[in-house]
Structure formats: structure tokens, C-alpha cells
Amino acid sequence: MSPAGVPDALPFTLVQRRGAMLVTHRSFRFRCVCGQMHTGSPNYGFTAPDAFVGQPPQVKAAAAYSRDFCAYVDTQGQRFYFARALLRVPIQLSDDPFMWGLWVQLGLEDYRQYLDAYERSDADFCLTAWIRNNLPVYPPTDGMPVQLVPQAGRQLATVRIPRNDHRLALDFNEGIAPARAARIAATFCLAGVKGPAPAEGTPIPL
């Protein structure tokens, strides 16, 4: 354990044989402040867009809401469209990323295009979207413009963040230091973010 309760991020290389090939995987591993050793990608996500969580009961009741999609009309008659997506933040010196399951907002035409791509296996394009969750360990991320990349086979779309000076954009484009990734994961562990999903809109393990 490092001084002052800071979790240790440890190198861990796994070599596997696949046929005639030896494949090396640099796994992320750290000893948490809880005393346990964790290996692999930290995974956390949100059950709903923050904007949807704050809507009154009648709006939620009339919404089209599922595990991966959300569309609703607010009390002013405005329509909103969202999709759940996966943000992979690289961890330096590791092949395991820090993964966030978050919600992005789309315009109507892009939402329709994404729904169509979700059912196909040949999607190869990007859509303009906006993150609609605040990641708790970063400066505000709600409203951050991103690119949404549909994936084949009804898989979650992935998120790309253009280069800018926001801490999340820097982490996405340059990678996050292993020790910092361990500290972030430890904050969720200490907060008891594990097991059954808590209330909608709060981080949960994917």
C-alpha cells in the first residue's frame, strides 16, 4: 500500500497462446484501499440520462425508456432523444481501458439513423452527440460534444471525444495514469458502488 491510503497500481502481463501465436495482454491491476486486489478494466455506468432523472413522474411515465434508449417529451412539449454508449478511456501502460457506460443526446434525424444502424451489421459512420451525464470524478461533463460511433450486432455505440482542454478529453486522448485510474476506481469502492443497481442516474458497475 502506498502512503496515505493511496492504492497501488501494479503492472501485470498475461501471455496467452492462441493457436501458434503467443498473445501478450498488459492487464490493469491494483490493490484498492479496501485491501482487495482488482484486475481488469474498471467499469461504471449510468442507468439513465441526468436530464431524464430530473423529470416529473408524468413525463417519465409517458417516456419510451429501455436499457439502451430513452426518448421523452418534457412539460414544455420539447422532445429529447438519448442512447446509452460506451466510453473507453485508455489507461497508460495497460491494454485495459477505464470504461464508462454513459448516455448521449442526439438530434431526431441522428437518433433515427442510429436506431437503424443498431439493427444492422454494417454500420460505419459517426454521429454528433452530447454527453448527458456528469461523471463524478471530473469537472462537469453534461453537454460535452462528442462523436458517437455505432457498432455492429446490436452492441453499444462507442464515444470519441475531440481534443480539448477538459480533463476527460485529455484522459481520453492521452491516457490516464495507472495510479490515478486506481484512485478513481477506489472512490467507487469506498462509496459502496457495487452489487445491485442503485437509483437511476447514479453510477453502477456495468
Residue ranges and their predicted role:
Residues A117-L206:
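C-terminal, charged low-complexity interaction regions
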